């Protein structure tokens, strides 16, 4: 029983950061246009992770904050000027990790 509790505690600790980053994406309304595994208005986070594979979280964070058009189709992503640099990097790190 004690071993099972330790395993569950370890799993909860490991899962918490991903949950927090998904919660941040929801709180900042990113999930209104993006989903983890399917295209909505914008690309799926898993597709973004593939496209940005090998690039830094800072580079993706900069792209998130700046917005842009033509990268993923005809619908532009608006600049996320209200998003802090720290939150942009947190989201970028989560996305590059496969949004898990």
Language-model segments: what does each one mean?
Residues 1-19:
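Classic N-terminal secretory signal peptides
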Residues 20, 29, 44, 59-60:
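Hydrophobic alpha-helical segments typical of transmembrane helices
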Residues 56-60, 88:
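Short amphipathic alpha-helix in the helical subdomain of ABC transporter nucleotide-binding domains
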Residues 32, 40-50, 65-93, 98:
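Axial heme c-ligation environment in periplasmic c-type cytochrome domains
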């Amino acid at each position: 029983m004690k071993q099972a509790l330790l395993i569950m505690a370890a799993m909860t600790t490991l899962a918490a950061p991903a949950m927090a980053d998904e919660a941040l994406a929801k709180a900042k309304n990113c999930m209104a246009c993006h989903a983890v595994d399917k295209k909505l208005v914008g690309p799926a986070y898993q597709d973004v992770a593939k496209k940005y594979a090998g690039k830094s979280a800072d580079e993706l964070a900069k792209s998130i904050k700046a917005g842009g058009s033509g990268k993923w189709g005809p619908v532009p992503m608006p600049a996320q000027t209200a998003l802090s640099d720290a939150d942009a990097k947190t989201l970028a790190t989560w996305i590059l990790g496969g949004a898990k």
